Curated annotation (Swiss-Prot):
This is Probable NAD(P)H-dependent oxidoreductase 2. The record marks K87 as: Lowers pKa of active site Tyr. It comes from the Eukaryota. Belongs to the aldo/keto reductase family.
């Protein structure tokens, strides 16, 4: 397979040009490994130019090594040819911790800046811990959204992050953030797939010019937070069979047609290639209609963030009922 060219989200005042498919690096239990670094390097060889990491995942060093090796091999001319997203974990989401935590992420990455820096969850836990799950007694009673965002804006002002955004924010929380943000969030990264289409959130993001980025596009089957609902869907299976595509490709193409950025996660080379083979065909109106009628169910509930001593007493509080 020749190196693929991945379409990009056009640059805007909020966001640098962003490849529409990114390679995720979260593997549970969270750990760095030579296997991860090798897979990321192979992904670069195949044409991937967008990599999604986080302090929690323990893979910032893997991204650093893969990008540095890709430059040494001439696969990319420089770090600037790669789009890197990272996220600040809840233990660093204290007003005075954001900038130091961003600098630590950059040290881990061996980079002067990230293209996109995200607030990982709208929640705060005791500083110094990067465990998940975490002891629920470490949950702070409130999430200082404005204080944290001012720190994110400072990261942007200092050039530590070319763009800033959020992850796992409901439509209501995103609107709350937009009400006071000086530097607006460029992106919101959330669970997204045909069985959890995020219709309400998508509407808000489109209206406000916030790029929607979707993780678990295939439902994350086999992980503690995923389900088999997507991969076991008879409707998606039938569409795939009719088109001569895989079920995974149907899911990814559907998200691509919605205008989303897709975050895929596989270290299998054949599936890496398959994930890039979605750009020269499209779903029919009838197929899109069938997908729109699929029953909806959230995979990642966020129950870890629900506790009596925190801001979210039930799952509905975390997601604001949406």
């Amino acid at each position: 397979m020749a190196m693929a060219t991945i379409p990009e989200v056009p640059a805007s005042a909020l966001l640098p040009t962003m490849p529409r498919i990114g390679m995720g690096t979260a593997a549970f239990p969270f750990t760095s490994s030579e296997e991860t670094t090798a897979a990321l390097l192979r992904a670069i060889e195949l044409g991937y130019r967008h990599f999604d990491t986080a302090r929690l995942y323990a893979t910032e060093g893997c991204v650093s090594e893969a990008v540095a090796e890709a430059v040494r091999r001439g696969l990319v001319a420089s770090r600037a040819d790669v789009f890197v997203t990272s996220k600040l974990w809840c233990s660093d989401l204290h007003a005075g911790r954001v900038v130091p935590a961003a600098r630590e992420t950059l040290r881990n990455l061996g980079m002067d800046y990230v293209d996109l820096l995200l607030v990982h969850w709208p929640a705060t836990v005791a500083p110094g811990s990067y465990d998940f799950p975490f002891p629920k007694e470490e949950m702070a009673p409130a999430f200082d959204m404005e204080g944290v965002w001012r720190g994110m804006e400072e990261c942007h002002r200092l050039g530590l992050a070319r763009a800033i955004g959020v992850s796992n924010f409901s439509a209501k929380k995103l609107e709350q953030l937009l009400s006071f943000a000086v530097v607006r969030p460029a992106a919101n990264q959330v669970e997204m797939n045909p069985m959890w289409q995020q219709r309400t959130l998508r509407e808000v993001c489109r209206r406000e010019g916030v790029q929607l980025c979707g993780y678990s596009p295939l439902g994350a089957k086999g992980t503690p937070w995923g389900s088999a609902a997507v991969m076991d869907s008879g409707v998606l299976h039938d569409i795939a069979q009719t088109k001569g595509k895989t079920l995974a490709q149907i899911c990814l193409r559907w998200m691509y047609e919605q205008g989303d950025v897709l975050l895929v996660k596989t270290y299998n080379e054949n599936r890496m290639k398959e994930n890039l083979d979605i750009f020269d065909w499209e779903l029919t109106e009838e197929e899109r209609d069938k997908i729109s009628k699929l029953p909806q169910q959230r995979g990642l509930t966020g129950m870890q963030f629900v506790c009596d001593n925190g801001p979210y007493k039930c799952v509905e509080d975390l997601w604001d009922g949406a």
